[in-house]
UniProtKB/Swiss-Prot annotation:
It comes from Shewanella loihica (strain ATCC BAA-1088 / PV-4). This is tRNA pseudouridine synthase A. Its EC number is 5.4.99.12. It holds the Pfam family PseudoU_synth_1. GO terms for biological process: tRNA pseudouridine synthesis.
Length: 261
């Protein structure tokens, strides 16, 4: 049988999602806990492989198992065997056609900026601290140039292994709630470091160091070296993955939890 899970995690102390030799990862921890509950080796597939220090409130995985378990075993039972910074949010049986990555039609990320003179104490691993005056309205205006299917070479990591630089951005919004600025972006898929590279360049606009039109110019240049530095990882969250409606997967608050959804 095939089971899908909704996962959230604080990626601060992990070397990314993907299992790696000699370093800790979210995938390794989750597979260990699932294998214990299933009493057999479990290998999982995820919707999006997050980098070191990146978080998720809406990660989705699936796995195959011969074990027959109640839903509570895949939620409460697995959570008991996970570290405190990883949690299963829901579980659902799915058909054999479902694939966490390839069935997904869109992914959504939120990047949380803590815009304050002083660094945070409590949320230091869940936000990226950028002091000084930031104009989120100009960031939002500039971000609209990203909409649609385009070549995102200027926002693609050098080590990106995708066969194509083209992605389709469905929506992007930059909003402020007090000292928090949220860059919320949804696309069919994302290139390696694409969101953080976009945020880095939007911040240049927000600080007034570049005009709103600069984002459009960067897209046309198709040159990563012309864009801004990659934004820090700790403000980034994978908050949602979209699937065909007939799967009826649970939809929870996007998060992170301090956002007023």
């Amino acid at each position: 049988m095939r089971v899908a899970l909704g996962i959230e995690y604080d990626g601060s102390r992990y070397f990314g999602w993907q299992r790696q030799a000699e370093v800790d990862s979210v995938q390794a921890q989750l597979e260990r806990a699932l294998s214990f509950v299933a009493n057999e080796p479990i290998s999982i597939q995820c919707a999006g492989r997050t980098d070191a220090g990146v978080h998720a409130t809406g990660q989705v995985v699936h796995f195959e198992t011969n074990a027959v378990r109640k839903e509570s075993a895949w939620t409460l039972g697995v959570n008991v065997n996970l570290p405190d910074d990883i949690a299963v949010r829901w579980a659902k049986d799915v058909d054999d056609e479902f694939h966490a990555r390839f069935t997904a039609t869109a992914r959504r990320y939120r990047y949380m900026i803590y815009n304050h003179q002083f660094r945070p104490g409590i949320l230091r691993s869940g936000v990226s601290h950028y002091p000084g005056q930031i104009d989120e309205a100009k960031m939002h205006e500039a971000a609209q140039f990203l909409l649609g299917e385009q070549d995102f070479t200027s926002f693609r990591a050098i080590q990106c292994q995708s066969n194509t630089p083209f992605r389709c951005v469905h929506e992007v919004n930059v909003t402020r709630q007090g000292m928090y600025i949220c860059v919320d972006i949804k696309a069919n898929a994302f290139l390696h470091h694409m969101v953080r590279n976009i945020v880095g360049s939007l911040l240049e606009v927000g600080y007034g160091r570049q005009p709103v039109s600069w984002i459009k110019e960067l897209l046309a240049l198709k040159d990563r070296t012309q864009a801004a530095a990659t934004a820090k990882p700790n403000g980034l969250y994978l908050v949602d993955v979209t699937y065909p409606e007939h799967y009826a997967l649970p939809k929870l608050a996007l998060g992170p939890l301090f956002m007023l959804d």
